[in-house]
Amino acid sequence: MDSQPVDVDNIIDRLLEVRGSKPGQQVDLEENEIRYLCSKARSIFIKQPILLELEAPIKICGDIHGQYYDLLRLFEYGGFPPESNYLFLGDYVDRGKQSLETICLLLAYKIKYPENFFILRGNHECASINRIYGFYDECKRRYNIKLWKTFTDCFNCLPIAAIIDEKIFCMHGGLSPDLNSMEQIRRVMRPTDIPDVGLLCDLLWSDPDKDIVGWSENDRGVSFTFGPDVVNRFLQKQDMELICRAHQVVEDGYEFFSKRQLVTLFSAPNYCGEFDNAGAMMSVDESLLCSFQILKPAQKSLPRQAGGRKKK
């Protein structure tokens, strides 16, 4: 699959050429280049742990959903790799118009900076979901169905969760009633699809709910919701300080829950053109102080800095 030599630097340059262009301009890579990105990134994901152990300083981003020009804005504010270390929390494809550019740039950066750039799996990095919500159709329209299957093979090897400096637990969705020790995550074998129930499903699908105690059924029809008591117990047991997750649109791009023990990040401003939400990126410094950079939904706005919370 990697027979023809492919220049990742050249791919990144071409993907970044549209900076400053009118949003929506496409970058059409060669099919063999995209296949190379999938194959090479997949081999890196498999070599690295399914539960990443990362160090601050790092910038964390939530859902992107094919909003490629907003991804470029995030990098403009946070610094293009390798200027900053990054962790993305999943949901790169579907819903937005440019899932292909979005995932290709992220995979290219993963290949170029494997120890400084990390992407987790979201519930949309799953064939049964992105078959329905736009990515399959985009692949079919711009390339072919076989390429969509190549992406599926790559997504099936993405890491599931990350821990930053042993204190900040990151995933796309949330906690699971089945999760008692980190070893359970480490034991999950890849490649794997996302099952309909169980630990892996919950980590990518569950949601916090301030109005409940314990666990409850989820309106999504998948996984569960969990109350502040669940968050508090989990952090105490694991000797951690914060859960950082994505998966839900929040008006300001970030939203705290359970006395600031959990934060939801969402990084696609003006989501789908239907929500008037901001997008946010969380910067974690060496002392684990968290601060937020906000992408306003209005097009030509500057980021505003929001104060964070000091961690021990």
Swiss-Prot record:
The modification N-acetylmethionine is found at residue 1. Transmembrane segments: none annotated. It comes from the Eukaryota. Binds 2 manganese ions per subunit. It is an enzyme of class 3 (hydrolase). It catalyses: O-phospho-L-seryl-[protein] + H2O = L-seryl-[protein] + phosphate; O-phospho-L-threonyl-[protein] + H2O = L-threonyl-[protein] + phosphate. The keyword Magnesium does not apply. The active site is at 124 (proton donor). It is found in: Cytoplasm; Nucleus. Mn(2+) 1 binds at residues 63, 65, 91. Mn(2+) 2 binds at residues 91, 123, 172, 247. Probably complexed with regulatory or targeting subunits. Component of the cleavage and polyadenylation factor (CPF) complex, which is composed of PTI1, SYC1, SSU72, GLC7, MPE1, REF2, PFS2, PTA1, YSH1/BRR5, SWD2, CFT2/YDH1, YTH1, CFT1/YHH1, FIP1 and PAP1. Component of the APT complex, which is a subcomplex of CPF, and is composed of PTI1, SYC1, SSU72, GLC7, REF2, PTA1 and SWD2. Interacts with BUD14. Interacts with YPI1. Interacts with SCD5 (via KKVRF motif). This is Serine/threonine-protein phosphatase PP1-2. The lineage of its organism: Eukaryota, Fungi, Dikarya, Ascomycota, Saccharomycotina.
